[in-house]
Amino acid sequence: PYDKMKFSTPKTLSEIAAMIGAEKYVGPADFPVTGINEIHSVTHGDIVFVDHPKYYDKALRSAASVVLIDKDVECPEGKALIVTDDPFRDFNKITHTFCPFVPSTAMIAPDAKIGRGTLIQPGVFIGNDVEIGQDCVLHAGVIVCDGTRIGDRVIVNPGTVIGGDAFYYKHRPQGYDRLLSSGNVVIRDDVEIGSLCTIDRGVSAPTTIGEGTKIDNHVHIGHDTVIGKECLIAAQCGIAGCNHIEDKAVSYTHLRAHETCA
C-alpha cells in the first residue's frame, strides 16, 4: 500500500506545532497525530487545514483529529487545534517534511516493482516506489510518476502521464502558491488508457481508476477523483478534481465535469 499521508511513527501536537513555528495550540501537548489529509479525505488521527470561513464548520466537524486553522474557535470535543496566520503555508511545511520530493536517478527507478509478463516500451519513465502488475503494456513515452499503483492487464498508450502534481493553488498578492501533493494514482485491473492523457495524483489521497474502465485519447482526470468500474470516457473529456463517477458511466467527447457526478 502507498500511504505517504501517514507518519511512520505517531507525532504529538506539540511536535507538529514546533515544526511549523506555531505559538498557539489547543489540546494536550501529547495529543497524538498520525498523518495529514486534505478535507475531502480525512480520517481519525489526521491533521486537516482550513483557511476560509466557508469551510470552518466542515473541517471542525470532519473526522480529522487536529484542525490547522487561522481563527480562534471553540475546540470540538476529542479534537485539537493549531492556530496560525497561514494554515496553507504550514500544511505545506508538514507535507514537505514527511513527504519530500525525491529526484529520480534512472528512467526506471531501482525500487520499481514490475510484474511478470509486463512489456515496457522504449522511452518509458517509471518513478520511485511504483508498482505495476502482470501482463501490462506501457507504450513509448509513457510517464509513471512516484507512488503510482497499476494493476494487472493494464494498457497505457504513448505519451500519457500518470501521477503529475495536483492543480491546487492559493492566490496571494504576489502570485500563486501551489499545495504540495502527497497522494498518488491507483489504476485497477484491465484498465486501458489512450494516448496523451493526464491523470493527476491526489493531494493527499489516491486518484483512482476503477477496474475495466476504458479511457480514450486526450483525457484529463484531476486530483482525488474516483472513477468507477467499467466506465467509458471518450476523447477530450476533462474531469476536475474531487469528482466521483459511478460504475459503468459513459462520458462523451468534450464533457467537462466540475463537481461530483454519478
Residue ranges of each PLM-predicted region?
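Terminal amphipathic alpha-helical/low-complexity segments used for targeting or macromolecular assembly
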Residues: P1-T105, P110-D111, G117, R153, ...
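Single conserved hydrophobic/aromatic residue that forms the stacking wall/gate
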Residues: H254-A262
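Inter-heme linker and motif-flanking segments adjacent to c-type heme-binding CXXCH motifs
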Residues: R201
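A generic local secondary-structure boundary/capping motif
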Residues: C145-D146, G175-Y176, G183
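Short coil/loop residues immediately preceding or within conserved phosphate-binding loops
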Residues: S182, S204
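Short, small-residue-enriched loops and turns at beta-alpha junctions
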Residues: D177, A205-P206
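A structural motif detector for beta-strand N-caps
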Residues: A106, A112, G117-I120, V124, ...
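Short helix-capping/hinge SLiMs at alpha-helix to coil transitions
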Residues: K6, G127-N128
